[in-house]
């Protein structure tokens, strides 16, 4: 894991973003600055190999069933060549169970966004210009879907996290609220502790537009969904979970 240091960072979408006028980015506004406590974040998403150890030790259900698409795992196992690929077809509840087992947590939205874009508010983890060759996406995947979690080092974030854009969407801890960024901007701590949707971030191999790969982008999905383009990574607070 890598330490993400304390310090004021930029969150949300501002006028310099090429998608600022898109209605789908309204939930990413306003842009604001905030200082959140330091924390550790996984360099990579959790892999099939890591998740297998969790399933074997705890008896948790394997990700061999999917809400959409065909799962990678079959009969509790995954293809050997997928060992270092991110585990997919995991619900938010599955991801949370893994984190609990590992003594870790899912990142909050603000933790995730700060780790992806650094202190300077860059639009993508590598800078402000879209480059389809710096992350796994629909246009460069060929006949493949996911890739190994250490792929595309040239697209790593300023802190050194891989695949914060592309490969798989990543679960965050937060419940979705359409005006959450308005609350963050005025330092209002009353975010929901229940709801209908959780949030994922980062875009995936399934996307062909730059819009979802931006660091500020997020979409609400059902926490029970298990789909072929969603995985997760873990965080740890300094001094504990």
Language model features with spans:
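Short, compositionally biased
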Residues: 1-64, 92-93, 120, 127, ...
């Amino acid at each position: 894991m890598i330490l993400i240091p304390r310090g004021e960072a930029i969150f949300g979408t501002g006028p310099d973003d090429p998608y600022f006028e898109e209605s789908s980015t309204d939930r990413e506004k306003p842009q604001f600055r905030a200082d959140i406590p330091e924390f550790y974040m996984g360099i990579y998403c959790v892999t099939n190999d890591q998740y297998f150890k969790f399933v074997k030790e705890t008896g948790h259900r394997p990700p061999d069933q999917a809400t959409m698409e065909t799962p990678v795992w079959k009969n509790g196992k995954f293809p050997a060549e997928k060992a270092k690929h991110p585990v997919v077809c995991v619900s938010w509840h599955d991801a949370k169970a893994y984190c609990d087992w590992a003594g870790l947590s899912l990142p909050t939205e603000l933790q995730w966004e700060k780790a992806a874009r650094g202190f300077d508010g860059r639009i993508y983890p590598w800078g402000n210009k879209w480059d389809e060759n710096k992350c796994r996406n629909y246009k460069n995947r060929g006949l493949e879907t996911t890739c190994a979690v250490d792929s595309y080092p040239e697209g790593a974030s300023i802190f050194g996290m891989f695949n914060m854009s592309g490969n798989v969407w990543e679960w965050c801890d937060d419940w979705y609220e359409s005006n959450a960024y308005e609350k963050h901007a005025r330092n209002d701590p009353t975010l929901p502790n229940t709801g209908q949707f959780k949030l994922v971030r980062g875009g995936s191999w399934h996307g062909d537009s730059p819009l979802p790969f931006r660091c500020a982008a997020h979409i609400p999905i059902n926490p029970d969904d298990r789909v072929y383009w969603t995985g997760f990574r873990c965080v740890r607070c300094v001094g504990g979970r």
